[in-house]
């Protein structure tokens, strides 16, 4: 494979980067989206975070939500979780929510390319997928885990179809 074969894909990925930051320009000024669920998560996870800071260990139970529940559903940090590093690499370390828009674009583009769709049509399809209104609604609501799942779904489908 020579550079002329991958050149259009490199250009399109660079376009995805440009669009991700152009759409979320306030990120470049240090601003962040204040999603409702993210704000409430800060309060829900305070007891767990305080315990982590004071003991250096992870709490496995919290009393600060629903009269008590397992902490792993809220804020346990797993040091052996390598997926977070893979996510950082694939999303190029971009801040949220630009990373999510980039993943939406890249994921659907890769899916369409794996289906042997022309790269120009694949790029248009990626923009159509990424700019679905629901994706931005869940970002504003603070549903970051759901947004990540939706962003990676096309890549999972591409991997299944490719094998």
Name each model feature, range by range.
Residues 20-111, 127-154:
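Membrane-interface coil-to-helix junctions
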Residues 9-13, 77, 107, 122, ...:
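Generic structural microfeature
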Residues 7-15, 100, 120-125, 149:
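Alpha-helical transmembrane segments of integral membrane proteins
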Residues 113-121, 163:
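Membrane-helix interface "capping/anchor" motifs
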Residues 2, 108-116:
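Membrane-water interface regions at transmembrane-helix termini and the short interhelical loops
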Residues 156-163:
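Membrane-interface transmembrane helices that cradle and orient dolichyl/undecaprenyl
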Residues 1-25:
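Start-transfer (signal-anchor) and selected internal transmembrane alpha helices
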